[in-house]
Amino acid sequence: MPDVRDIQEICGRLDRGEIDRDLFFEQLTRAVSDLIGCPRAGVWLFVATAEGRALRCVARYDRRVDRIVGATDMLNAAAGPYFETLVADGCVVASDARYHPATSVFRDNYLEPLDLHSVLDVCFSVNGVPFGTFSCEQAGAPLVWSQRQIQMLRQIGSRASLALLNAANAHTDTQPAALWEPSSPNRLLTMPAPLDPEEDDAHRGTT
């Protein structure tokens, strides 16, 4: 039975050098998928890009193909309502994501092509500063997200935040991770170098 303590064990493996950054993200997203009970789970980091603020996917596991799949940056300019809700509430809870005000922008290019119906994204912080999000997605039919699932994602973020910071900075091609200042949540401080997107051609945030 999946347990949130599995997250601590995965973080410990990274801290002890038993797994590298890529394997850490794979194991973490697989564990999140199991714990939340959804087929897709990912980790996104706040970054600054030439087009403005964005979220960058560092790993996303899809149980339907049993592997990590890629994604392009999710840009605030293209997904304003989503970012506004995420910043204001610390989460986006969209059981009917195709018609939810924060996520309907993703319907044509992302949700419908991938048969996704529900989205649950929860922010996590490092030292009190928003650093990224955990994203869970339900396929096949809508899912009403429970308070237990929302709280579970928050617990995962709390337990994994420092390991996520270390993993984000461990890659030789990655600069210090992007943080939103608590006093000015719209301003980004630094920018990780881009990660190459993989096979997922349909994506959020580019239209």
Roles of regions detected by a PLM:
Residues F124-F134:
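Short hydrophobic/glycine-rich mini-motifs in sensory/regulatory modules
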Residues M1-Q27, D34, R148, N166-G205:
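Signal-transmission linkers at sensory-effector interfaces
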Residues H117-S125:
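A short, aliphatic-rich beta-strand micro-motif
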Residues T133-L143:
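Short beta-strand-to-loop transition segments that serve as allosteric relay/switch motifs
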Residues R30, V43-M74, A78:
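GAF sensory/regulatory domain recognition
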Residues R13-G17, E26-L35, W44-F46, E84-T85, ...:
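Amphipathic alpha-helical regulatory segments at dimerization interfaces
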Residues V126, V144-L165:
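Amphipathic alpha-helical "output/dimerization" segments
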Residues V65-E112, H117:
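Regulatory sensory and allosteric helical modules in signal-transduction proteins
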